[in-house]
Amino acid sequence: MAIVRQTLVYQGPGGPFEGVIAYEDEVTTLRPGVLVLPNVLGQKEADNVHAENLAKLGYVALAADVYGQGKRTRHGPEAGIYMAELNADRALLRDRLAASLDALKGFDRVDPARLAAIGFCFGGKCVLDMARAGLPILGGVSFHGVYDRPDYANADPIRAKLLVCHGWEDPIAPPEKTVALAQELT
């Protein structure tokens, strides 16, 4: 079997968006889908590699784009410009996450009833926001995420199973924010 990696352009608020989807070429049954959500730098090669690695495990994975086609950043002072726009409008972020999930769900090799999301830093925040918004993911993993709550009401109850991988001394999410997240999700 070979892993296929292809660009997937999809629509959403403020789009179009350009992600990369990866899957095994010989699989004929519908597979679980995993949305890979990027850090502050946005969709990039490292996310595509994560998608390929998930495809090797039998998933269909979409390295999502939440900033918009052609909006890419690099390390340095401008790195957070697009993230700051979405942090200021969490409802827009939620809607872009929903559009990314819809793109994954609509891919012809994905079982739309078996969806999950993983994310790194800002992407970890995105995973938590998907669960908070009640988007149809069965589970999510936040790696060193950002834990501040959005300004919209959480789904009640949050149905997605969540794994939060976090370093206690992380300056972006200090212990008191980690405790607040635990209280929120309990």
Model feature map: region roles:
Residues 1-186:
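N-terminal cap/leader regions of alpha/beta-hydrolase-fold enzymes
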